[in-house]
Amino acid sequence: MIFHTFLLKYGEIGLKGKNRYMFEDALVRQVRHALKDVDGKFDVHKSQARIYVDCEGDYDYEETVEHLQKVFGLVGICPVVRLEDKGFEELKKDIVAYMDEMYPDKNITFKVESRRAKKSYPKNSMEINCDLGEAILDAFPEIRVNVHKPDVLLNVEVRNEIYVYSQVIPGAGGMPIGTADKAMLLLSGGIDSPVAGYMIAKRGVCIDATYYHA
């Protein structure tokens, strides 16, 4: 399956208060910076506590994910299928098609987990979970439900559009670089100083490194 959108999740930033937008904006800038050397055209934007990367035309999937995994502040990178809201019956067909293409081996367990950010949607999260799960079971009787430890956790986020994903690639975590103070790092020649630099950069500190040649 070819993905043209990534949904990016952040962690600690979500705990911020009225200044959360500053951290989100910094993270968007870092994502754009990380993708500037990747072949392809990317539109990075934020909406409703999520950051999205829309990939226009051809791009290198593996290279894109590799660069995103290095961005401090991201805890999850989700390749998503973005769907227009054409009604629930169409959504069920799209979900069945997604499961069929993503998981040719149907000897799996699954769970549907939905998030209804669009409160005007006619079904609540529990109804979405049950009805989509029923559609999958009707289409593939060999698939089983496991709500505790499923092989596949199928996420459905209902917003202005509908986002479907079942992969969450781990991110670097931490805070975006530039959201804390600056610091100087003395590179002594051992392994401890670059490790310390990595750990403090992960807290959002912008580092300038110094090395004395003797």
Which residues fall in each region the model found?
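RNA-binding accessory domains that recognize and position tRNA/RNA substrates
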Residues: M1-M184, P194-A214
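Conserved G/P- and acidic residue-centered "switch" motifs that form tight phosphate/ATP-binding loops
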Residues: G190
